[in-house]
């Protein structure tokens, strides 16, 4: 914090504030900390900017916070696609690296596009529930002739909840 205060002192040459590394450090501090009564405090999670809009690491401004169930990290996600044909070697057919905060379900079509470009589209694509929704079940077949196989998540919207009768 003292370094940032010195850099923004009116006697400090302005060009020092314009160094990219200094700006990344400043934004990381703004996103993660605040000063209260002269003391540096960590921002509560509820006051942080959304994961895709904040700097979570001064070392890599593209690395973002993510969580999946009980695991949390700052970095990226890697989506691997593997061939699973019987009596054949299992081979990695596609690697897609994304920002960690992006939803897995939004990567399914990107994987299919990449596999199509390489002429490696499977007739069936077995995935976990994070990569399936009702729209993808239809569009994977209609656009790519791929049968998407995987459990769908339960509908948790308010419309899907049982009606409670008013008394």
Language model features: what each stretch is:
Residues 1-167:
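Anion-binding and metal-coordination hotspots
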